[in-house]
Amino acid sequence: MSSSAGQRWEKKRIEAKQRKQAAFPSGPAVSDRGSILLCLMLSAVCQGCAPTDIHVHPKSAISEASRTIQKSGQRTRLTSEFLEAAKLEGNNSAVNRVAEQRYLKLALDVWAALRAAKDQSDPTLLEIHNQALANYLQLLSPGDLAIGTADEIVDGRRVLVVLRDDAKPDHPPTFDQLIAAERLRIRGLRERYVRPGLGARMICQQEPDRISALSRYTVPEKQQVARSAVFKAVSLPQGRIEILLVDPSKTERIKLDGRFWGVGGDFSAPFAAIGSRTRFIFQRWQGLFRMEHYANRQGIFFLEPYDPEKIPVLMVHGILSSPLMWKDLTNRIMGDPVLQRKYQVWHYTYATGFPILTSARMLREQLDGVNIALQRAGLPPHQPIVLIGHSLGGLLAKMMVSDSHDLIWNQFFRVPPDQLNLTPADKDWVDHVMFFEPRHDISRAIFMASPFKGSKTADLILFRFSSRLVRFPTELEEHLYRVFTRNRSYMVNSKENRLIAKRQPSSIDLLAPESPESIALGQLKVARSIPFHLIIGVRHGSSLTRSSDGIVAYSSSYLAGAESELDVPTGHTVTHSPKTEEEVLRILKLNLQPKNRGF
């Protein structure tokens, strides 16, 4: 390369870096409204305008108490006491203290009535008991929660209330706040999965533990955990009450005072509380156009504390999307009586503007990081993963379960890597991006509406123009320049490769059917040891083979050798279809059979 060409490249690189540094230090600027509008247009095309937001709104204690009275169809002494306690709640800590003690007294009275009754399933008594105990726990001070005890007055007698979590019964709970799930109104989820039974249905909030080796894999927002609170032991003469927080996904029945009780639980509220705290409308935009600003949001995130006995379901979203696209599927898995005991949901979020091979390398590094973190924490390794990918996420998933051989390299270059002009860092980058093997920690894959042979949508003017707005991190730009531009004379002579040598391609460019990545990814074979399933949208077309979901053609989403295939009469947002959810639940239950388990 001539010195003048090198100077021009260096000037362009500096200008690009300056543009990135000026772009959105804290959010989108006024001058970027055109890009935001373009992002929203792309989102409408890619996601079909499907709603992905979750909203959680608190309900007042009085409104919830009134609803309980109306639901019971009668106003008894207990329902009246419940309403009176609710009326006391307010912003005054002293008044809340009185309400707290009234809730506790009411919960104890109803618990005594339930134990004395022959019929344990009295819905009115159970409702009042559960909500009174839930409201009591919500009013506990942070100081009481921190030490796991509270001094209370019951019938004029001083009582020590001891709070314990069933996960670690010998230690105080590590929760920062307890929220009564019944007092939250949820919008944005198709269903709310609640199991009736004994127990105050709680959302237990927990700040990510920054010391733990697994802290980087907890959700950036407060972790929300489902628990059901019960009176494990009540001894008023001795001045002691023990309240146990039970994980309802693991415990369906509990023995108290010599009798077995069905444990209730709210399995949707904790996930809704997580989803309502995210700001993915701007993060999706940054993930496509301004990847440097998405760096602190990338990664694999556990939606619940790690459990080595549960199988991870790892969900990978597509271009210009976010984990919230999986909200209803995640909710159904968490609400299913069988799957909630056997599976834990993990979400992978990433900047979707990166070249596809780069995004795949980052996912492999994240999976390796999880394994290393578990080992450092002294925890057992995770169960074999069920990997689910939609659209671009399906391409990443396929690269986790395939052997690249030389297929990808040969689409770009005519000579082996050792004949290129590469620095050691570039050689390492090439080795990890263009060459890979099937992972041994994945047991099954589900591909949804994935463009294995590319998508003609990427050739549309709107998408081509959008790709010009994508800005890579400087380090990646320099890798791409040194690997491709410096070695252009060794590249396979094609229109697409000439474009790559001239301008760094985004994921949008590389989704075009003629791109070298699309050609290579279409040739990759899923490892025979890993069963896979297809879910394909087929809304448009005169026949199955000529149909498409409006974005991806059936012929591009189809892979030979699938264990099953479901063709859904819907658009590209096939993830939102109840038929898709039913199929995923079927596959997950199939995966539980002994012959389908293991690495």
Regions found by a protein language model. Give the residues of each.
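Bacterial N-terminal signal peptides
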Residues: 35-47
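Flexible, membrane-associating and regulatory peripheral segments of lipid-active enzymes
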Residues: 49-313, 322-328, 344-347, 376, ...
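Serine-dependent carboxylesterase/thioesterase catalytic core
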Residues: 88-89, 93-101, 105, 112-124, ...
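Short amphipathic alpha-helix adjacent to the substrate-entry channel of hydrolases
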Residues: 327-343
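C-terminal subdomain of alpha/beta-hydrolase-fold enzymes, centered on the catalytic histidine
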Residues: 471-599
